[in-house]
Amino acid sequence: QVNVYNNGVLVRTMPTSMGMGGTQTVAGQTLTFWTPPGVYTVMDKSNPVVMDSSTYGLPVNSHLGYRETINYATRISPDGIYLHQLDSTVWAQGNTNTSHGCLNLNGDNAKWFFGFSQPGDIVEVRNTGGPPLSLQNNGDWSVPWAQWQAGSAPA
């Protein structure tokens, strides 16, 4: 589930369906269907946005391929992880992970989160079973402070 906090106070709880897990090799490239755990930030928002699996190497006409216009899409990673409306997975939200990596929400919750969140807001994803969020995919906030300091220039 997605718990939304404002200044440390829980303001909304929303069931979600995240990445289904597993991998598939297409044309020599291994694609993963996990939602990486880690600390993301809201990057931008689009309403609507066209999501197309061929943009990351999964042909639209393949078994898991897709090209859909999606409403209330809040992007949290440069490789295309969003919190977004997907009413076709309402049956799974809160109990089964079925997505390619995004966090699916029902229409009311996606619209609310889209309106509530701002670029720069923290989104922490936990307990997905997948590999951790990488730095190149907006994982800067996942780096422990001591490690961050160790990589900085001397004062």
Please identify what each model-predicted range represents.
Residues N6-G8, M18-M20, D44-S46, D87, ...:
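A mature extracytoplasmic/lumenal domain signature
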Residues T16-T25, S46-G57:
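Short regulatory "switch" loops immediately downstream of catalytic or recognition motifs
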Residues W34-P37, V49-A155:
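Exported/periplasmic cell-wall-interacting domains
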Residues V2, V42, T74:
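Conserved hydrophobic/aromatic pocket- or pore-lining residues that grip, position, or stack substrates
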Residues G38, V42-D44:
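A structural signal for short, hydrophobic beta-strand segments that form beta-sheets
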Residues Q1-G38:
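Cell wall/extracellular polymer interaction/catalysis modules
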Residues Q1, K45, G107:
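Residues immediately flanking
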